[in-house]
Amino acid sequence: MISPDAARNVVGIIGNVISFGLFLAPVPTFWRICKRKDVEEFKADPYLATLLNCMLWVFYGIPVVHPNSILVVTINGIGLLVEGTYLLIFFLYSPNKKRLRMCAVLGVELVFMLAVILGVLLGAHTHEKRSMIVGILCVFFGSIMYFSPLTIMGKVIKTKSVEYMPFFLSLVCFLNGVCWTAYALIRFDIYVTIPNGLGALFGAIQLILYACYYRTTPKKTKAAKDVEMPSVVVSGTGAAAAAGGGNTGGGSISVTVER
C-alpha cells in the first residue's frame, strides 16, 4: 500500500508539471506582440501580479522560512524567470506612459517585498511563525486573484458565447485546482487548500458555462482569439516528504481569457 507521503509526492509532481505548463499559456500573446512590435490593448497588470505572487512563494520556500520546500522554490523561481521575460518583452514594445506605470508598480512590489522580508526575518524568530505570516500573505493575494475569472464568466453569460473562454484552458485549470486540493487534503495544509479549492471551484463553473453556451457561440468571428492571462497564481507549501527528506510544493493557477 502506498504511503500518504508517497501519494502526496506524486500528486505534487503532477501539479508542478501542470503549473509549469500554465506558466507558458501567454506565449501566443507575446509571440503576437513581438511580431507586431506593439502591445496593443494588452495590459501588464496580470504579469506584475504573478511576479509578486512568485516572489512571495519563493520567500516562503527558502530554508529560513519553511525548510525542506525545494519544489516551492524551484517552480516559483521558474515562474519569476518566465514572468520577468514577459515583462521585459512588454516593456520593450510599450509606449512611454505604459513603461513608466510598469516601473512604478514594480518599484512598489519590490519595496513591499523588502518590507515583508525584513519584517518576517527580524520580527518572527521561529519557522512556524515565519511560514504562517508569509503563507497568509500568499493565500490572501492568491485568493484575490482567483476572483478575476468572474469577469469573463459574466461576459459568457451576457453574450451567450464562450469565444474568449477556451475549453482547454478551463479544463486544465480545473484539473490543476483539483490536483492541488487533493495534495493539500492528503495531509491537510490550509495554505494550499484555500487557493486551490477556489481554483477548482471556478474551473468547474467555467466548464459548466462552456457546456451551457458552446452551442450558441459563433463558429467564425473576425476577432483574433489571442490568449491573455489576467491571473496566474503559483502557490506552494512544503508538506510531503521527498527523497532525502525534502518536501514538495503546491501550485495553483487561474487562467482566464479576455478580449
UniProtKB/Swiss-Prot annotation:
The keyword Transcription regulation does not apply. Keywords: Cell membrane, Membrane, Repeat, Sugar transport, Transmembrane, Transmembrane helix, Transport. One of its GO terms (cellular component) is plasma membrane. It is found in: Cell membrane. It holds the Pfam family MtN3_slv. Belongs to the SWEET sugar transporter family. This is Bidirectional sugar transporter SWEET6a. The gene is SWEET6A.
